[in-house]
Amino acid sequence: EQERLVFHVLTKSLNLPAISMWFLINPPGKATVHILSIDNFEWSSKYNIYQENNSSDPRYTSELNYLRFYLPDIFPALNKIVLLDHDVVVQQDLSELWNINMKGNVIGAVGTCQEGKIPFHRIDMFVNLSDPLIGKRFDANACTWAFGMNLFDLQRWRRHNLTAVYQNYLQM
């Protein structure tokens, strides 16, 4: 049912003309494409979308990396969304992702740890757990997940006000 597919492409205004032209030249069949510039979002001015951190690494300074935490605000009419990062290469039909039973979870994601192996991507590699307030809230050995492909239950996210929870963690 390709006509029911809607791709929301989010980008910086600098890239908007090139991406728009690419989709004009390469239309996605019967699917719809909405291309949006994050520079036009009202919500970005009311949130501190990334911490000041003296880093020039775009993984930590680009607003695009923080968008997933604001999806319920960006798409208030949507209840569920499959998020694919810019570097994901799709090799098969992803429609079954839509039918995954999330068992009450807000996020469905690909884990980065394999059973029986030493975890390579643990939470303590990404979060400073030396602060006791933060350290007691997280399991240092917990595995992280791959950010490249996620399924979000936006209704549940809104119900639990998780954007506010995320904002609180940023302030710590």
Describe the function of each predicted region:
Residues 1-172:
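Glycosyltransferase catalytic domains, chiefly GT-A lineage
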